[in-house]
């Protein structure tokens, strides 16, 4: 097999490719890399290298196909060589230290080959590594930041010096040492041997073979702690303190070197300071070491000319702000960087960061600022103003730094392009010119400052800078330009610069080059290069987008992105706009606008700030705390009772015992107070924050649709998107509870204090006299002093002074906290009722402007502690059957992900299509889900291509004649039959007009006409279907519901009996229920399964179906709700309103008997809406039976338990006609869509099939109730009556105003503070209904 073949086929090479160098028998073979296996790789061919989890492999070559050639050393020393896939391993720098740390950890035993799935990252080991690294970071000492380097993963043996000498730090491969052993490796293709050099003194190969292409002069930096130990031992032995000098490394970093110890460190080692010791006896390195400019090559890095070279050893590196090269391991990153996986820098887009007025956000602005500052610097030089020159240079310094940072952050744009070398070269020139501007500018201005009196103007500007140097005149001219020539060696400007120097010298006449000429040249040079760099990046940023996928470590992105042309990376540290979560602080009322930029991250936020749903379970827990707090307060108050003080505590010893007992009881109660505070602080207010509600005068002005945010007015300017009195009252009480707990602690401690005034606040300062003239008037000044005295006395009377009576003060606080906790309990009960009302109403009316995601957010916030690791739920691949030959096994089996029950959770498109047409098994449920949901995974063209490729499956190589015949009969023929059957099912039962694509259909038709397809009986049928589709005919038509052949019941209210202006009460409630049922069922049957998918999934569904049927159904249900409410509010007399309410309760109950849950829900939604439910005087006239019936129906449709009772009722409906409540289906579809990712592990190759299966199950439930229709007779007059009223009924907002006119809002009465809370809570629910966003 040729090299080209195996590269294109992506199979492991069987021999060294022609372009590779084949080592001879006697030639040592050097490794390229050292890696560790993360998975078991069994190896199915003789050329494969079998791997076990944790094996150390030395990579000898890397093929472009992704297969690497490596060697493994066994326990007995034997070597085995072969090919293995690169995605089964990770670099030793990444994995080895973690495995070493976890070698005795029981968690490692749980990592088995069962977790292996093709092209899926192994989650168990990854999570284990992450956990280990996070623990190591938390347990690291204060100076652990020194370890943020590659060498933190090196073992102690790597850099441990010998006992006899301190200068024993060895380089990775010492060219002067012959201590190497030759090991023979068996070749993978023949019996010849190759040699591999290994250092004999190393106990582990992995300690030596780290990094790519390590040179002979590379050094291994020592750990800081080890170096500090060596320094201390050296000081104790020789009574001298060594010194460290900084050296530059080949990758542009600073590394510290000690000549005495011959040790390198990436961080500066420190010694302990001993104040009693004498002055340190410092030992300095030699001058040759200090002056040596040779860069140091550090192990694990690659040679770089400057810090702008690629970080990962190739130009294809991705951005990571914490990495300098590819060998940086995970432990070198901070906890924040290990959490965020940003592949792009942030860009200075609008409304993302709080910006300073001086911040620069665009490339053009940067260019203009640079040009402007350079002009000012020239002017300052011309005006001989040293202060202005220094000021402008400081600004230029910031601009150059911003330019360098922007180029570095944006390097992914120019790497591997024709602009890469140009960009690097011009940036070097900018830095060089910047330095020369400062040097020549300062020298020029210094000459003017010190020599102005000694030289005339002619001599002044002809002054030679060489004369300032105390060197010979022959070298005087070379000194100012030496740095220029050194920096620009080999640059394109060399000739031009030399010509300019010659011109300048000739113009001066005396051969001198002055500072100002150099300065002007450098300014022009810097200006030119900055403009060129900006021009390059303007070209590079054209048509570039900022996408969320650049920041959430996924390769899936549905957003179109934001244009970033002419936008700089964010080079300034700034706060994010409207982000109030960070570190340990989370604000529950501000949701992040940029989920990928969330500082703390939603997962971290939920991990440390678990939220609790405000439900009856939370109420029960809160009630227990309140009971314990009240009991403790009563016990303390008994001990503080003034009546028993003289009887039982008549001496100091008894009073001390009493105080001790009070302290014990108080701190016991504080424990319950603390638990209660923690509980109420964890309440989740997602529902209240996500729904807008209006109070006060806002209702008078709101007459526009709340679907249009532009008409909301000034009432919505605040970021707080709720206005609930009950919520605000809850927060007021919560703060009051906090204050009381603090006061009780101080009051309790004051019982035993000798000086109770210790807790008294500092004396307030005298008020500021803004009018000094008035303060000079004696009477005015006396009045101010008198007011201060009276105010202080008043504070004493109010109990502000602890010294009056600590018992009385503590007793008052205990009484207050007992009342406050009971009030908090009452408010919590109202919060529960309000939350249920919001969710019930929002779900029942199925408002499009209601953000259903609020329920998802609430669920995610509260259930994080209960959720298992999603990654660990998936295991890979089908189990192979032992009695099936290998050539008859399923295809792409290991690309399927299964759950513990064997259901398919996901997989690649190819694997899913292979399972769809499997030759050994028929999974009908899987087929039905796939054919319904395939458009969300792939286009019709992709599906047909995969099916055709499946039909034309090729036999594997190496089959005998008998095996080939068996393969044809047992595998190929069944697969072909399955392919044709799948195509037939798609056209017959799962076709949507959204799929119509004429080129694809014609290609499909060509395939159907082929001889191979026509050999099957279904071939002609397939051709017929495709030709009909191309002619515009419909093949798939939903069946009409079956209506029984029996005679329908006669209408109880005939159209002829109704007057020209009928009233609703003229229609019999039974007949109205029938007519409503017919209307709802007709609209329900128009809803297709494809419309449901398009409604919830949107563009991701891959459908262009109309959702008008769903819109009309929701509109009709909401019109019925408005109709019922308005019919009640039209009556001014409360008793007549009661008659209408009783009538509609009967209608709703009859709808329930007809299984018309849609109309029933719409009616009870109207009766429980705020305009109707707030009419207390009206509800007082209702009889108990009607109220009980209404409560039962409301309980049936209660969403607090996910409609469990309603779902149970639906299960027992067989062949009877039914109109289900569509809002439940919408909620379920929305939860599945938003609560599950489209792809597993954020990889587009791994389709989340389980999400599609759940969606298909819900949609199938919708179609279930379309089969049987209602045998009722339609009354056109009643239908026209309903149509007329439905169109002109006012909205719920307008109805609320009518409700206020009928029964005005009650005002809370109560002047005292003790009653204000009670009055507020009893009337807290008298406000306007919410409008849904």
Curated annotation (Swiss-Prot):
Residues 900-1034 form the N-terminal Ras-GEF domain. SUPFAM superfamilies: Ras GEF, SH3-domain. GO terms for molecular function: guanyl-nucleotide exchange factor activity. GO terms for biological process: cAMP-mediated signaling; cell division; cellular response to glucose stimulus; cellular response to starvation; filamentous growth; filamentous growth of a population of unicellular organisms in response to biotic stimulus; filamentous growth of a population of unicellular organisms in response to starvation; Ras protein signal transduction. One of its GO terms (cellular component) is plasma membrane. Residues 17-27 have a biased composition (Basic and acidic residues). Residues 1-27, 133-206, 474-497 are annotated as: Disordered. Keywords: Cell cycle, Cell division, Guanine-nucleotide releasing factor, Mitosis, SH3 domain. Residues 167-176, 474-485 have a biased composition (Low complexity). Residues 30-94 form the SH3 domain. Residues 133-166, 177-187, 194-206 have a biased composition (Polar residues). Residues 1068-1305 form the Ras-GEF domain. CDD domains: RasGEF, REM, SH3_Sdc25. Pfam families: RasGEF (PF00617), RasGEF_N (PF00618), SH3_1 (PF00018). Promotes the exchange of Ras-bound GDP by GTP. This protein positively controls the level of cellular cAMP at start, the stage at which the yeast cell division cycle is triggered. This is Cell division control protein 25. It comes from Candida albicans (strain SC5314 / ATCC MYA-2876) (Yeast). The lineage of its organism: Eukaryota, Fungi, Dikarya, Ascomycota, Saccharomycotina.
């Amino acid at each position: 097999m040729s090299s080209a073949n195996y590269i294109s086929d992506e199979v492991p090479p069987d021999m060294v490719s022609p372009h590779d160098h084949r080592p001879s028998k006697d030639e040592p073979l050097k490794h390229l890399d050292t890696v560790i296996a993360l998975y078991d790789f069994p190896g199915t061919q003789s050329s494969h290298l079998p791997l076990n989890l944790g094996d150390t492999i030395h990579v000898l070559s890397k093929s472009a196909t992704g297969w690497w050639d490596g060697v493994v050393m066994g326990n007995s020393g034997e070597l085995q060589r072969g090919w293995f896939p690169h995605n089964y391993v990770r670099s030793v720098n990444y994995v080895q230290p973690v495995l070493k740390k976890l070698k005795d950890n029981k968690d490692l035993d749980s990592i088995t080959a069962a977790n292996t799935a093709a092209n899926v990252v192994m989650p168990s080991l990854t999570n284990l590594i992450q956990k280990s690294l996070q623990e190591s970071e938390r347990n690291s000492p204060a100076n652990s930041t020194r370890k943020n380097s590659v060498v933190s993963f090196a073992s102690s043996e790597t850099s441990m010096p010998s006992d006899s000498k301190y200068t024993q730090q060895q380089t990775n491969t010492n060219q002067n040492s012959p201590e190497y052993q030759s090991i023979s490796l068996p070749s993978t293709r023949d019996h010849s041997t190759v040699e591999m050099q290994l250092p004999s003194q190393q106990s582990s190969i992995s300690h030596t073979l780290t990094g790519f292409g390590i040179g002979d002069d590379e050094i291994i930096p020592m750990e800081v702690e080890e170096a500090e130990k060596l320094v201390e031992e050296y000081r104790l032995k020789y009574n001298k303190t060594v010194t460290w000098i900084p050296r530059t490394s080949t990758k542009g970093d600073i590394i510290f070197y000690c000549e005495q110890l011959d040790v390198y460190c990436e961080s500066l080692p420190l010694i302990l300071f001993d104040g009693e010791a004498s002055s340190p006896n410092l030992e300095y390195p030699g001058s040759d070491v200090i002056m040596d400019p040779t860069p140091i090559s550090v192990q694990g890095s690659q040679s770089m000319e400057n810090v702008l070279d690629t970080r990962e050893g190739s130009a294809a590196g991705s951005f990571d702000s914490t990495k300098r090269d590819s060998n940086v391991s995970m432990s070198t990153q901070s906890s924040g960087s290990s959490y965020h996986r940003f592949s792009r820098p942030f860009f200075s887009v609008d409304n993302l960061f709080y910006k300073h007025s001086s911040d620069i956000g665009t490339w053009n602005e940067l260019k203009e600022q640079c040009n402007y500052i350079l002009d000012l610097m020239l002017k300052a030089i011309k005006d001989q103003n040293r202060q202005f020159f220094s000021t402008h240079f400081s600004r230029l310094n910031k601009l150059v730094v911003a330019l360098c940072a922007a180029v570095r952050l944006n390097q992914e744009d120019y790497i591997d392009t024709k602009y890469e070398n140009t960009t690097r070269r011009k940036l070097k020139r900018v830095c060089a010119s910047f330095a020369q501007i400062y040097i020549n500018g300062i020298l020029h201005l210094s000459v003017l400052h010190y020599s102005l009196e000694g030289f005339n103007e002619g001599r002044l500007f002809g002054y030679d800078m060489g004369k300032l140097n105390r060197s010979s005149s022959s070298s005087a001219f070379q000194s100012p330009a030496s740095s220029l020539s050194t920096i620009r060696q080999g640059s394109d400007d060399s000739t031009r610069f030399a010509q300019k120097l010659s011109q300048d010298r000739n113009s001066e006449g005396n051969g001198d080059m002055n500072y100002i000429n150099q300065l002007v040249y450098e300014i022009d040079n810097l200006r030119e290069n900055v403009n060129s760099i900006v021009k390059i990046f303007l070209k590079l940023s054209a048509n570039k987008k900022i996408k969320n996928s650049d920041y959430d470590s996924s390769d899936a992105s549905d957003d179109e992105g934001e244009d970033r042309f002419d936008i700089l990376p964010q080079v300034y540290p700034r706060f994010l706009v409207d982000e109030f979560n960070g570190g340990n602080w989370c604000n529950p009322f501000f949701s992040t606008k940029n989920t990928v930029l969330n500082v703390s991250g939603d997962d971290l936020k939920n991990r440390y700030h678990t939220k609790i749903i405000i439900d009856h379970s939370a109420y029960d827990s809160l009630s227990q705390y309140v009971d314990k707090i009240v009991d403790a307060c009563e016990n303390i108050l008994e001990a503080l009772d003034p009546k028993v003080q003289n009887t039982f505590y008549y001496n100091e010893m008894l009073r001390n015992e009493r105080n001790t007992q009070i302290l014990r009881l108080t701190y016991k109660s504080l424990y319950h107070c603390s638990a209660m505070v923690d509980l109420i602080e964890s309440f989740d207010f997602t529902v209240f924050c996500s729904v807008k509600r209006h109070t006060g005068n806002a209702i008078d002005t709101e007459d526009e649709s709340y679907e249009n945010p532009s008409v909301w007015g000034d009432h919505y300017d605040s970021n707080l998107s709720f206005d609930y009195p009950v919520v605000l009252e809850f927060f007021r009480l919560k703060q009051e509870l906090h204050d009381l707990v603090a006061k009780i602690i101080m009051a309790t401690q004051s019982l035993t204090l000798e000086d109770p005034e210790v807790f008294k606040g500092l004396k307030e300062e005298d008020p500021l006299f803004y009018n000094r003239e008035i303060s000079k008037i004696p009477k005015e000044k006396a009045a101010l002093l008198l007011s201060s005295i009276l105010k202080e006395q008043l504070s004493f009377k109010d109990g502000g002074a602890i010294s009056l009576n600590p018992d009385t003060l503590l007793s008052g606080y205990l009484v207050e906290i007992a009342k406050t906790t009971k009030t908090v309990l009452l408010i919590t009960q109202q919060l529960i009722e309000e939350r249920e009302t919001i969710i019930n109403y929002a779900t029942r009316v199925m408002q499009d402007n209601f953000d259903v995601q609020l329920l998802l957010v609430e669920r995610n916030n509260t259930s994080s502690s209960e959720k298992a690791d999603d990654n660990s739920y998936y295991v890979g691949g089908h189990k192979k059957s032992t009695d099936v030959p290998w050539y008859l096994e399923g295809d792409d089996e290991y690309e399927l992900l299964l759950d513990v029950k064997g259901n398919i959770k996901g997989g690649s498109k190819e694997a899913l299509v292979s399972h769809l047409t499997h030759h050994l098994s028929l999974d009908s449920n899987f087929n039905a889900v796939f054919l319904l949901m395939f458009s969300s995974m792939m286009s019709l063209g992709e599906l047909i291509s995969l099916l055709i490729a499946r039909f034309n499956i090729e036999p594997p190589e190496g089959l005998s004649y008998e095996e080939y015949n068996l393969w044809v009969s047992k595998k190929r023929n069944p697969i072909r039959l399955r392919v044709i059957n799948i195509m037939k099912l798609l056209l017959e039962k799962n076709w949507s007009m959204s799929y119509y694509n004429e080129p694809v259909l014609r290609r499909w038709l060509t395939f159907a006409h082929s001889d191979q397809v026509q050999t099957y009986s279904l071939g002609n049928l397939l051709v017929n279907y495709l030709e009909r589709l191309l002619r515009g005919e419909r093949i798939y038509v939903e069946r009409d519901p079956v209506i029984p052949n029996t005679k329908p019941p006669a209408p109880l209210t005939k159209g002829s009996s109704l007057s020209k202006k009928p009233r609703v009460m003229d229609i019999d409630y039974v007949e109205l229920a029938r007519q409503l049922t017919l209307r709802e069922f007709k609209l329900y049957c128009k809803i297709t399964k494809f419309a449901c998918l398009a409604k919830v999934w949107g563009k991701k569904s891959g459908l262009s179906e109309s959702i008008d049927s769903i819109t009309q159904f929701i509109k009709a249900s909401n019109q019925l709700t408005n109709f019922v409410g308005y019919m009640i509010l039209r009556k001014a007399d409360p008793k007549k309103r009661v008659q209408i309410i009783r009538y509609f309760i009967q209608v709703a109950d009859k709808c329930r008997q007809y299984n018309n849950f849609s109309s029933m829900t719409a009616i009870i939604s109207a009766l429980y809406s705020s305009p109707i439910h707030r009419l207390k005087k009206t509800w007082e006239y209702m009889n108990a039976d009607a109220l009980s019936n209404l409560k039962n129906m409301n309980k049936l449709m209660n969403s607090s338990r996910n409609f469990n009772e309603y779902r149970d009722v639906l299960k027992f409906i067989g062949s009877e006609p039914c109109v289900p409540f569509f809002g439940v289906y919408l909620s379920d579809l929305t939860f599945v869509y938003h609560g599950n990712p489209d792809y597993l592990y954020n990889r587009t190759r791994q389709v989340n099939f389980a999400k599609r299966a759940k969606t298909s199950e819900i949609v199938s439930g919708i179609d279930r109730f379309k089969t049987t229709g209602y045998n009722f007779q339609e009354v056109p007059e009643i239908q026209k009556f309903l149509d007329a009223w439905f169109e002109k009924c006012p909205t719920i907002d307008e109805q609320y105003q009518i409700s206020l006119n009928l029964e005005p809002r009650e005002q809370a009465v109560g002047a005292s503070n003790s009653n204000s809370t009670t009055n507020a809570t009893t009337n807290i629910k008298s406000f306007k209904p919410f409008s849904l966003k």
